[in-house]
């Protein structure tokens, strides 16, 4: 499935047109095709139901150790909306726990687990492979220096939506260290709108999600950063050392789903405006 999707990406009109433009600037066709395939492999998820089942079993144990309760509200409307729309989850971002608890909550409610846009800083040895199996696909912080990468990534988002896969990404781009919402970054939002305008079997609907923590798992590192310490890039040793936190209790966790924002309706209401 993953290899077939990568082949489709490379053969798409969007990627081929970008390659043609780069050929006019002196790049060779064979090198561009190898680069495009390398980009696609670096991005694409490799969702495995077997890995997901193992992952979710571990998460059940994890939540029971870490939290005194996980409370969910607003999920009832999602099943009905998913019949007519492909859902795009757009949560607030406070913790690395966010995407774990969202996938877990949706699975326990009998809903499709989303493909999750993750920063390539999480694509570490072993961890990255495991996250891909759970539906993560990886993205660079900036696409500006590489138009071929940008084209491959945008086509990947379109192909996922074309196949009816739910998506998840954080509009803030990164985790908020202060608890306040960060200004939205519009790259992935634009790709979703562009995908809708290209034509999809089902229109898209954005689902706001709020995570409320009594105590944030990364609270101590956030405090250090706010006091002036340098922000650390994630690595495997940090993840392994964080396992000691399971001896603590972090109180209750609340997951609140907002009403889906149907993109087809929104576009129809704004068709006379310059978007």
Q: Where are these predicted regions, by residue range?
A:
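Membrane-interfacial terminal anchoring regions of lipid-handling membrane enzymes
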Residues: 1-275
């Amino acid at each position: 499935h993953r290899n077939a999707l990568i082949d489709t990406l490379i053969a798409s009109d969007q990627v081929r047109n970008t390659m043609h433009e780069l050929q006019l600037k002196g790049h060779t066709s064979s090198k561009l095709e190898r680069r495009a395939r390398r980009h696609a492999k670096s991005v694409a998820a490799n969702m495995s139901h077997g890995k997901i089942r193992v992952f979710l079993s571990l998460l059940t144990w994890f939540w029971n150790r870490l939290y005194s309760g996980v409370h969910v509200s607003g999920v009832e409307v999602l099943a009905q909306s998913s019949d007519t729309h492909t859902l795009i989850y757009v949560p607030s971002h406070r913790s690395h726990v966010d995407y774990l608890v969202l996938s877990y909550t949706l699975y326990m409610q009998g809903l499709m687990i989303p493909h999750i846009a993750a920063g390539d800083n999480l694509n570490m040895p072993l961890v990255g492979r495991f996250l891909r199996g759970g539906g993560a696909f990886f993205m660079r912080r900036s696409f500006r220096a590489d138009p071929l990468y940008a084209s491959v990534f945008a086509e990947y988002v379109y192909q996922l939506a074309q196949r009816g896969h739910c998506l998840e990404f954080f509009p803030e781009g990164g985790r908020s260290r202060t608890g306040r919402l960060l200004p939205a970054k519009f790259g992935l939002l634009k790709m979703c709108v562009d995908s809708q305008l290209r034509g999809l079997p089902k229109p898209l609907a954005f689902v706001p999600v709020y995570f409320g923590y009594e105590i944030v798992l990364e609270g101590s590192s956030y405090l250090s950063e706010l006091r002036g310490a340098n922000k650390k890039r994630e690595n495997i040793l940090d993840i392994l050392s964080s396992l000691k936190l399971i001896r603590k209790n972090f109180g209750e966790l609340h997951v609140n789903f907002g009403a889906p924002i149907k993109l087809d309706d929104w576009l129809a209401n704004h068709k006379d405006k310059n978007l």
